Amino acid sequence: MPANLSSALETFKQQRDAAEAHYLKTNRVSVFFREYTAAVETLLAALWVEHFQNSALCLMAVGGFGRGELYPCSDVDLAVVSPAPLSDGIQEQIARFVQTLWDCKLMPSVKSGGIDELCESVRNDITGDTAFLEARFLFGNRQTADELAEKMNAQRNVAAFIEAKLVEMEHRHAKSQGSGAVLEPNIKSCPGGLRDIHTLLWIAKAQGLATNLPALVKQGILTRTEAGMLSHGYRRLAHIRIHLHLNAKRAEDRLLFDLQPQVAESMGYQGLNLRRQSEELMRVFYRAIKTVKQLSGILTPMLQSRVSSTPLRVTLRIDDDYIQVNNQIAARHTDIFFRRPEHIFKIVEIMQQRNDITALEPQTLRAWWGATRKINRSFYQNSENRHRFAGFFRNGNGLTQTLRFLNLYGVLGRYLPAWEKIVGLLQHDLFHIYPVDDHILTVVRNVRRLALDMHSHELPYASALMQSFERQDILYLAAFFHDIAKGRGGDHAIQGIADARQFAADHFLTEEESDLLAWLVENHLLMSTVAQKEDIQDPSVLDAFCKRVQTHERLSALYLLTISDIRGTNPKLWNAWRASLLESLFHAAGRYLAGNGGNPHALFGRRQQEAADLLTRAAVPEKQQKKLWNALGSAYFARHQSREILWHAANLVHDFETPIVRSRILPQSDSFQVMVFMPNGPRLFARLCRIFSRHGFDILAARAFITEHDYILDTFIVQIPSQHAPEDYPDIQSALEAELNSFIHGHTVAEISSHSRRISRRSRYMPIAPSITITPEEDYPDWYSVEITAVNRPFLLADMAEIFFAHNVSLRYAKISTLDERAEDSFTVFSPDLKNPKIQSSLKQALLEQLA
């Protein structure tokens, strides 16, 4: 590289480093862009002189560089333009110029060609046309640059351009769905991200309007408030993106888990642990994109309407204050929301009641939103407003859209201060994927879908139950309040009771309705906890659950709320196995509450009699049956449900000395039930778990039982890896049975290290602290309940079983609750040694070391 270029490159590096250092001191986004852009232009000037001095070509900044928005690791978008088609010699010159840019590590993105060629290239290329919309002359022949801009502007169909940009935005938003996009969002392309702000300004510029916010205020396009909010949202997002590039040292626009703590710390979120820093950063991010979405929803249709051909307007009178324009509602006088604030809710009420109205007319929306910022205590205390707000839930129609609309524009947070505290609050607990406010509204949506015939095919039984439930509005409110106390510290279910009762008192609910609402908020985790963590075959578990529930109405409401909550937490959590757990508990509790629970001994006897009846119908002699029951022992009927007993008995009654393996595909699910019967021996349970994990199965539940003649009868429910289609299940079943049969007959089976499979990036960088509790069972001496919470990973259950074995603890039952990347496992174990506090402490320490 020539000496003059080496000097220019060194100057550039110094200016770039100075710009970054200055930014880290001041956090002024606009100053960084100006200084960094100037540094790049200084280097480009030297390179241009070296390659194209006295040329008819010109160099233009396009795209992000053109608008002066250059991030630390962004591409430098350029265009080399010629008044005439490029000759071979000029093309070679341009190639050398581009290579020099790469040598300088500028990451160039360069378009080149003659004026006509470039105009033709972007005619049907919306991305290229957009890049040149922001073209800015740098060096060379200015006349060439002016001619290119003139021709491109002349050929651009503004209405078609705007339509294409809006379609592009829809597609971009559609790609930003799913858990990954929520947890590790792309700050540039997500809904409400930087690209949405750019789109708004492109639509304005294509119409010949200004592209800076103060000028748009002067032109009457934006109000000062709107410009201020949009500017604030933009600065927040740009601030995060600059820090993201600086920490990643690459053009990374996703807020990846491993980068979130680094970005948060460099932005000044100090004095907090890494998880809290990340949560605070993400909350700032979600609030910023919410502001952008608010303004985009108002300004985009307004800007579009300036140039789009107006369709036939169908105007209908609604009442003295409102008219319907096509599918939108418009206020006759937009100052009505300031003069009569009760209309803030009234217009929403009308929109909810009318299926033919889907939106507020843009000018009406703008005025309505401006008035919502006046919502205060006086507005809340107005009984008309309270009646209308409660009416949104009583009506039910369009409830989800109504609440999401009110949340998007900040009305829920202004009306209910408790709601404002959860807006954008993300939980790094390895299974929630939505901010708390989005999660709550998704749960409301799920409850509402159960009430609609059109969605009955999704969950037929739950839908029928919901559609016969008398007080659906209380269920909607329970969904709305169930997590409203998140983020305050302490038990959010208990803290939420006060919010729910205050709302009920203020919004004219009866005492009975208030009691049901408060009970559901307090106990919204009860059913999922019992179903997923406890052994509902144990009569004492069912008895304790029903004492909490007390009535069939509460049971039905809790069942419906629990289903909706799990489905609204993370799409990965809802599966046929969880559905069956909840349904089993629901029906068992229903029978109990109806007086059919019976005493435990009668229940166990009934289970044995059902199995005996089955064997008698199969012509099994009574003498043979008694031999089987004696081998299994009386405790067997206390620890297994009827369906398992019937299955075991049919397979064991003729021979309960020979080891066997049996499996069956559970109906309407992606799971197998597997039974293993063989002589007892060391580490058998752990080794069986390793076989399942080696095949990629998730163990959902496991029951370890030792017969009177010292055989193990272990029963597992395992989930088939998601990449397999149902038609593959029989082959998978055969392969699994073959390996298990080899194992029970003494053949060596290869064991794989617990750490041979990696855990996810989220689990690595946002781990949860493992916790362990060991509690003695009240009615069973030497029996203990062990509760473990940890990051989920392959071989977790096998490793726990190994530690139990090493500490002379006999594992008898395991209930595995896998919540995406979080494991909440419950074990029932037998060990007289655990009476000794030192041994119990040693066990706990060993488990913690394995989970760390």
Curated annotation (Swiss-Prot):
Quickly give the catalysed reaction.
[protein-PII]-L-tyrosine + UTP = [protein-PII]-uridylyl-L-tyrosine + diphosphate; [protein-PII]-uridylyl-L-tyrosine + H2O = [protein-PII]-L-tyrosine + UMP + H(+)
Give the CDD domains listed for this entry.
ACT_ACR-UUR-like_2 (cd04899), ACT_UUR-like_1 (cd04900), HDc (cd00077), NT_GlnE_GlnD_like (cd05401)
Report residue spans for region: Uridylyl-removing.
319-672
Gene Ontology molecular-function annotations? [protein-PII] uridylyltransferase activity; phosphoric diester hydrolase activity
Q: Which UniProt keywords apply?
A: Hydrolase, Magnesium, Multifunctional enzyme, Nucleotidyltransferase, Repeat, Transferase
- Where is the ACT domain positioned along the sequence? 673-757, 785-852
Biological process according to GO: regulation of nitrogen utilization
Q: Name one Pfam family in it.
A: GlnD_UR_UTase
Q: Which cofactor does it need?
A: Mg(2+)
Which residue numbers delimit the HD domain?
436-558
Known EC number(s)?
2.7.7.59, 3.1.4.-
InterPro entries in alphabetical order: ACT-like_dom_sf, ACT_dom, HD/PDEase_dom, HD_domain, NT_sf, PII_UdlTrfase/GS_AdlTrfase, UTase/UR
Q: Where is this region: Uridylyltransferase?
A: 1-318
Superkingdom to which the source organism belongs: Bacteria
State the activity regulation. Answer: Uridylyltransferase (UTase) activity is inhibited by glutamine, while glutamine activates uridylyl-removing (UR) activity.
Q: Tell whether Magnesium is among the UniProt keywords.
A: yes
Q: What's its job? A: Modifies, by uridylylation and deuridylylation, the PII regulatory proteins (GlnB and homologs), in response to the nitrogen status of the cell that GlnD senses through the glutamine level. Under low glutamine levels, catalyzes the conversion of the PII proteins and UTP to PII-UMP and PPi, while under higher glutamine levels, GlnD hydrolyzes PII-UMP to PII and UMP (deuridylylation). Thus, controls uridylylation state and activity of the PII proteins, and plays an important role in the regulation of nitrogen assimilation and metabolism.
Q: Which family does it belong to?
A: Belongs to the GlnD family.
Q: How does the record comment on the protein's domains?
A: Has four distinct domains: an N-terminal nucleotidyltransferase (NT) domain responsible for UTase activity, a central HD domain that encodes UR activity, and two C-terminal ACT domains that seem to have a role in glutamine sensing.
- What is the protein named? Bifunctional uridylyltransferase/uridylyl-removing enzyme
Q: What species is given as this protein's source?
A: Neisseria meningitidis serogroup C / serotype 2a (strain ATCC 700532 / DSM 15464 / FAM18)
